[in-house]
Structure formats: structure tokens, C-alpha cells
């Protein structure tokens, strides 16, 4: 079953998407870990992957979730976020996780994603947007 699913995904998915996924998560992810190991040997610490909580708001009220929906909305503005991502890319990172709250409540999320086509973004979402 898993082999059929993998075969179907490889054959029916747009080849550009498969290539970009393999490049960003495969080679660039491996390279990011190798650079991280080299930094550790030099006594420097900078994580191989960066997870960023870009907003504290959410449209749901899930039991057990840490997001305080009664709290005033706070978000990272676009320019500081670009600087953070660019600095991480200079350190060899190409994999970023965007979390929140609900990341798609950040009005400029697509601007952020479009500005960094050389990076892979994993967006942690509740799926309602």
C-alpha cells in the first residue's frame, strides 16, 4: 500500500513540486545539519532548523492549547521577520517552521513566503484557512 502511494505521488504530482521538495528537504536539509555539526565543533550554536511563532492569535478555542485567545494580538512584523530568516539562511538554514496561534491569521504570511523562494516553510495550521 505504501509503495503504491509513493509511486502515485511521484508519478502524478507536478515534477517541479517533487524536485523542490527533494531539493529543499533532502539536499538542503542535509546540508543544514552538516553546517550545524561544523558550527558545534567550533563551539558555535545556531540550530539547523528554525521554528518561528509569528502570531499569537487563533480562530479556534481548542482545549489544551497554549494560545490565550483573550490576550491582545501580537505578531512579528514583516521586516524583522525577513531579517531573522535572512540571518538564518546566511548561517546555512533553509528549513523554517511557522507557527502561532494560527499562522494564516498573519495578514502578510504570503508576502513572507514569496520573499524567500529558496527556503522550505512548514506551516503549522489548524486547517481552517
Predicted ranges, named:
Residues 1:
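Conserved N-terminal ligand/cofactor-binding loop architecture of enzyme catalytic domains
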Residues 7-129:
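Conserved alpha-helical substructure of the radical SAM core
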